Amino acid sequence: INPSGIYVDVTYGGGGHSQEILKNLNSNGKLIAFDQDQDAIENKSNDSRLNLVKSNFKYLNNFLNYFKINEIDGLLADFGISSHQIDNKDRGFSTRFNSKLDMRMNSAQKIDAKTIVNDYDKDQLEYIFKNFGELRNYKKVTEKIISERAKRPIETTGDLKKILSPLVKVKDENKFL
């Protein structure tokens, strides 16, 4: 790391990676970090070298222009959900808890996982599970969800886990569910 460099963390999360970058920067160094999750924003390090932007990193170029930054020395991207999102039962990411089916990266977004599994049509669900979930058995998953939601709404992570468990090998449960 260049001690006086400019770095970007596009997935701030709990701030652990950003803290490591900041440890290696001198007073001239800068770190621009992005996160759309309010919990991450509230977890912000109080460091004048850090600009934490509450936004999706897809707007990276816009914000670099705003901060008048033409070149960066490095970029960190730790994609996926963060441990604090998994450990918070109210976020609805983990099947360790039976909680509301939420799973929003940004809790201010209107559409949650409950809406998706209960309201999206077959083609939309298949597209999501195939392309974002990278599931080989996306058609079976979709069929099972559509069949079960016809009986009653899928409300919780526990409901979803119960519905999908027959489709998952025990060794793959943590990866799949």
Labelled PLM ranges:
Residues 1-177:
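S-adenosyl-L-methionine-dependent methyltransferase catalytic core, i.e., the SAM/SAH-binding region
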